[in-house]
């Protein structure tokens, strides 16, 4: 009996310790140290890329790369083995990372993140190729940011381009209070992403006024069971020019606008099946509880999907991307 009691005691201790460790890991993790980037030489480095290069792989501790005021004209890449980076700027007007490149979406991006577990705050990412004054260039893909890892939180940041601005390639991503500007497919990819309180700014009427209309989103999923989708909750659609809310980059595309404000830049038809023509039944394009001059759905495409209130709420909740509670462990100031 003593052996049994001793064995049971050990089991109880192991369970208690497991619960303690789990509870500890669920709390927000701390930043191990901060690297400062300053164009004027007042920090550890003068470029963002050199700061990232200084981090030894593989990295499993949160490291903040704090970037001071300035326009950093460089391409920045976070490689796969360098996760747990908190890229923080002074604000979208103060800290700008920009570059002038175009064509292939896999090489033109100003900013690319391959790693998992990334936090970004207070930075503008810009591809200037199509948005220079008096632009006479042909409009081509020119990516501002390419997000290719899992578990990203991006707050109070801006993405600026014209065609293919934000490549939300894959993974679970949470964007809050961000501004995304562009004219053609300016949020595109296969991602599983929630956009909260963001502004989608149509600029085709500024940089390419001869184009009749643009498109905000271009999404696709590889299969009906894939959990991906772009969900815009409490967002604002505004700008200059006319636009569709989205078009299907492929079958099974899923884009949901929930309780968002749609200005008159939105065309009455709203959506385009594009590469899923003939398979419209497989698309999940949804508008729920939206307001504004562009929110009238009476002339929308006939295959616009209708979901129940509970279904929409499920997509618009943080749980859509955060089933395992990863956001609560991120070192986010003020919470997500």
UniProtKB/Swiss-Prot annotation:
Its EC number is 3.1.1.11. Its main location: secreted. GO terms for biological process: cell wall modification; pectin catabolic process. Pfam families: Pectinesterase. Keywords: Aspartyl esterase, Cell wall, Cell wall biogenesis/degradation, Glycoprotein, Hydrolase, Secreted, Signal. Coiled coil: none annotated. This is Probable pectinesterase 66. Transmembrane segments: none annotated. Pathway: Glycan metabolism; pectin degradation; 2-dehydro-3-deoxy-D-gluconate from pectin: step 1/5. GO terms for molecular function: pectinesterase activity. The active site is at 164 (proton donor), 185 (nucleophile). SUPFAM superfamilies: Pectin lyase-like (SSF51126). InterPro entries: Pectin_lyas_fold (IPR012334), Pectin_lyase_fold/virulence (IPR011050), Pectinesterase_cat (IPR000070). It comes from the Eukaryota. Belongs to the pectinesterase family. Glycans are attached at residues 44, 201. The keyword Glycoprotein applies. Residues 1-27 form the signal peptide. The keyword Cell wall biogenesis/degradation applies. It is found in: Secreted, Cell wall.
């Amino acid at each position: 009996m003593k052996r049994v009691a001793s064995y049971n005691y050990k089991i109880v201790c192991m369970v208690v310790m497991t619960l303690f460790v789990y509870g500890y890991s669920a709390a927000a993790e701390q930043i191990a140290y901060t690297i400062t980037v300053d164009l004027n030489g007042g920090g550890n480095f003068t470029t963002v890329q050199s700061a990232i290069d200084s981090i030894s792989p593989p990295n499993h501790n949160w490291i903040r790369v704090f970037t001071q005021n300035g326009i950093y004209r460089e391409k920045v890449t976070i490689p796969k083995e360098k996760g747990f980076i908190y890229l923080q700027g002074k604000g979208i007007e103060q800290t700008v990372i920009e570059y002038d490149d175009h064509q292939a979406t896999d090489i033109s991006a100003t900013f690319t993140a391959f790693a998992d577990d990334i936090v970004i705050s207070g930075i503008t990412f810009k591809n200037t190729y199509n948005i220079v004054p008096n632009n006479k260039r042909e409009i081509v893909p020119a990516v501002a940011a390419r997000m290719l890892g899992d578990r990203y939180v991006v707050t109070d940041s801006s993405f600026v381009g014209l065609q293919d601005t934000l490549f939300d390639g894959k993974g679970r991503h949470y964007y809050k209070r961000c501004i995304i500007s562009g004219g053609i497919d300016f949020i595109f990819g296969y991602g599983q992403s929630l956009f909260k309180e963001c502004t989608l700014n149509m600029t085709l009427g500024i940089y390419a006024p001869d184009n009749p209309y643009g498109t905000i989103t271009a999404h696709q999923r590889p299969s009906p069971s894939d959990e991906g989708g772009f969900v815009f909750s409490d967002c604002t659609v505004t700008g200059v020019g006319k636009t569709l809310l989205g078009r299907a980059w492929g079958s099974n595309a899923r884009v949901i606008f929930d309780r968002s404000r749609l200005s008159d830049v939105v065309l009455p038809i709203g959506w385009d099946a594009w590469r899923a023509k003939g398979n419209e039944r497989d698309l999940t394009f949804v508008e729920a509880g939206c307001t504004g001059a562009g929110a009238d759905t009476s002339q929308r495409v006939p295959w616009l999907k209708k979901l129940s209130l509970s279904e929409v709420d499920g997509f618009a909740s943080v749980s859509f991307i955060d089933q395992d509670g990863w956001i609560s462990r991120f070192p986010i100031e003020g919470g997500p």
